[in-house]
Curated annotation (Swiss-Prot):
Record key words, sorted: Acetylation, Centromere, Chromosome, Cytoplasm, Cytoskeleton, Kinetochore
Name of the gene encoding the protein in the UniProt record: DCTN5
Record organism: Sus scrofa
Assembly description: Subunit of dynactin, a multiprotein complex part of a tripartite complex with dynein and a adapter, such as BICDL1, BICD2 or HOOK3. The dynactin complex is built around ACTR1A/ACTB filament and consists of an actin-related filament composed of a shoulder domain, a pointed end and a barbed end. Its length is defined by its flexible shoulder domain. The soulder is composed of 2 DCTN1 subunits, 4 DCTN2 and 2 DCTN3. The 4 DCNT2 (via N-terminus) bind the ACTR1A filament and act as molecular rulers to determine the length. The pointed end is important for binding dynein-dynactin cargo adapters.
Protein name, entry field: Dynactin subunit 5
GO biological process, one term: coronary vasculature development
GO CC entries: centrosome; cytoplasm; dynactin complex; kinetochore; nuclear membrane; nucleoplasm
Length: 182
């Protein structure tokens, strides 16, 4: 299936020198602690909580509308500690997700309306289907599909998943064009 052009109003997005496109309607708390490594798209009404701990996002990632990305925390007897959140390259996070993971590897697809529980680890080349809720501290192995509530193993992915995710994220970025370039 070929992706059509996705047009956006240039005044509604900020484009950085490294090619990141961030919606002006998104909220980046503690932006000095948020690193977007390049050609990443953050769409409208997203929230990235860099004020809690460092958030690092790799290259060619897409965070779609109304998703929340926040670092994981752990409760201790003396209070709460937040830990950095690392997201790899070529990660696609669909609409309405809440991501509270410790780590998301590269070439990962998170479906619509998912909740990734605190301190989850999503290894490279995995997929989380729509409406999945992963319990805290779940580890999703490489080349697996998780679905349901609670999120459980439901299938495997082919060895070409890495190439597929590279194609998807790069083509999405190339087709995400300002209205003036049409």
């Amino acid at each position: 299936m070929e992706l059509g052009e996705l047009l956006y109003n240039k005044s509604e997005y900020i484009e950085t020198a490294s090619g990141n496109k961030v919606s002006r309607q998104s909220v980046l708390c503690g932006s000095q602690n948020i690193v977007l490594n390049g050609k990443t798209i953050v769409m409208n009404d997203c929230i990235i909580r860099g004020d809690l701990a460092n958030v690092r996002v790799g290259r060619h990632c897409v965070v779609k509308s109304r998703s929340v990305i926040r670092p994981p925390f752990k409760k201790f007897s003396k209070g709460v500690a937040f830990f950095p959140l690392h997201i790899g390259d070529h990660v696609f996070i669909e609409e309405d997700c809440v991501v509270n993971a410790a780590q998301i590897g590269s070439y990962v697809h998170v479906g619509k309306n998912c909740v990734i529980g605190r301190r989850c680890v999503l290894k490279d080349c995995c997929k989380i289907l729509d409406n999945t809720v992963l319990p805290p501290e779940t580890v999703v192995p490489p080349f697996t599909v998780f679905s349901g509530c609670p999120g459980l193993f439901s299938g495997e992915l082919p060895e070409c998943t890495q190439e597929l995710m590279i194609d998807v994220t790069k083509s999405y970025y190339q087709k995400f064009l300002p209205l003036t370039q049409v």
